[in-house]
Amino acid sequence: MEFKYWIVPLAALVPNIVGMVWYGFLFKNTWLQTVGKSEDDLKQGSRLVAFLLTYVVGLILAFGLIPIVIHQFGVFQMLNGVKDLEDVNSALSNTIADLMTKYGNNFRTFKHGALHGTLTALFTILPAIAMNAYYERKSWKYVAVNVGFLAICLALMGGIICQWL
């Protein structure tokens, strides 16, 4: 597997781009209502700071998605710390090289990455946001708007990472 490391910073832009459409146009009024804010409240603070912080968090999400959407990482996770892997001439290194030559591109599609990004959102993001929302006495609309945003972000990011990293 040859990695194109510039893909991760590119994928990290997704939450900013999707957020502009999601919270700026599609669900702006619903979102403002569920968080108890007005448009005037949004004018306070720096948009640049919000963009930069969202980008940093997007980087964290992108790096976290790599082992989720690229199954080939499982082989290396299982063999982490095995000394034979460090020796490029060892039988293990040769076996891994053969394995990666044959199967290194299996399941490396946008569709597969988007699937795992969506599943990650449904099975980790949804429960986390829902738990907090219930304690904060937020509505189901609050959960739906925020989980929907993150599900789309993780699907797109997962697809980008799986296909092109």
Where are these regions (language model features)?
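Juxtamembrane/disordered regions of integral membrane proteins
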Residues: M1-L165
